[in-house]
Amino acid sequence: MTVKKRAKALTGTVAGVMLFSVLAGCGGNSGSKAEPSGSSGNAAEKQVKLRMIESLTSPDRTTYLKEMLARFESQNPNIKVELISPPFDQADNKIKTMLAAKQDLDVLEVRDLTVAEFVNNGYIEPLGEYVASWSEYNTITDVSKSVGSLDDKLYFIPNGMYQRQLFYRADWFKDAGLNPPTNYEELVESAIKLTDPNKNRYGFSFRGGSGANAVPDAIIQNYNFDNIDHEDPNFLNDGKTMFSTPEAKQALELYVKLFKEGSPKDSINWGFSEQVQAFTSGVTAMLLQDPDTIPSLKEKMDISTVGTAPMPKGPSGKSFVFAGGAGWGVTSYSPNKDAAFKLIQFLSGAEENTAFAKATGLVPIHTSASEDPFFQDAMYKSLLEMGGKPDEYVNLKANTKYPGTGKWGQVAMETGQAMLLGSASIDDTLKKWDEYWAKERENYNAK
């Protein structure tokens, strides 16, 4: 999941070093100095029913979220919350349909991938006025605030932060005499060596379905490392898209090889759940994923067989890393905005957010969580390592300003599957991707 990104690394503590320094530094308030509407008397004086929808749905996450809502309701007996939990692969479309029809909805989970589209369509409320006098906002990390903002306006408060690392079967690597890969070429070579279809063993948990764009985007960016525009990372410093270069073709050739020679054939349709299940069930040796997979790995695997490694590097010897997130926003047409923000304030407070992060495998948004022993776990070791080497693992904020960002995953999945199945060439696929992003920039600049 994607969720976009930037931060400075702290040193020493997990939250400072860990994970793209997601727990790094807290900034001052932004927005107006008005009293936060969430603390107004109206919400406390009348009976209110809030409708809330989540996007990154999973059974365990939904169960824990309901426990949080029950605690909120016990402290606020005048406010009742109805939680809508669509299946993960359908959730964003469900949210967009409800917003377009202005169906009853007060609180929604906004993603870094959807915020530009929602803002462009006027679906969500800026939160600057609401957070201005909320004391705990001061301890939310700068990177969390950045992920929840667009054009310097805050639109959602992240419920946790994401950054990918490599999970690998340490026992398989040891038996094969392999070291964990440090770059994408080594990753593909290791995947091929560890693949044995006769044993139903494959090197890599490929994801060709929903969310398929994450890996090819990352490889292409890293193969264009020295020329990427850090303020607009699907583009180069000369204004062309990153898909227009010879390096992009080299990267995509490697990606196709990874699928054809090191991954299960049916993984062309896999989404998040399938790729994680393949790893936990002993079908695949490597998985590139966010820390929210950690609880599942601990539950379903002998964790001593799992190793972690930093994200692979490109030919430059460096790697871009991304901090992303999703979180809670308020619909622009909600009649209950004060009560809605009161709920968000509760869910986003340091105590509740840190507990939620532990339950879901995310990184908390508050700097006060930085010394928590929970995050000293070995599963977070590589995240810590990447955060401690900011010149080697360079933080990059993906651009969320383009309305087409939310549609890119679907476009990349459909065209990418055609390429992997051989019905489209690598050159033709790159041309389509280049045209897509060039048009996005053209439309954006024409506004």
Question: Which ranges hold each PLM region?
Answer:
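Conserved N-terminal structural module of periplasmic/extracytoplasmic solute-binding proteins
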Residues: T2-K4, K8-G16, F20-Y123, A132-S135, ...
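Hydrophobic residues within well-ordered alpha-helices
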Residues: I95, L187, L194, D217, ...
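Glycine-centered hinge/linker elements that transmit conformational signals in sensory
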Residues: A191-K193, N237-I268
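Long, aromatic- and glycine/proline-rich binding clefts that accommodate carbohydrate-like moieties
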Residues: P77, V306-P310, K358-Q410, Q417-A418, ...
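Periplasmic-binding protein-like
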Residues: Y64, Q345-T367
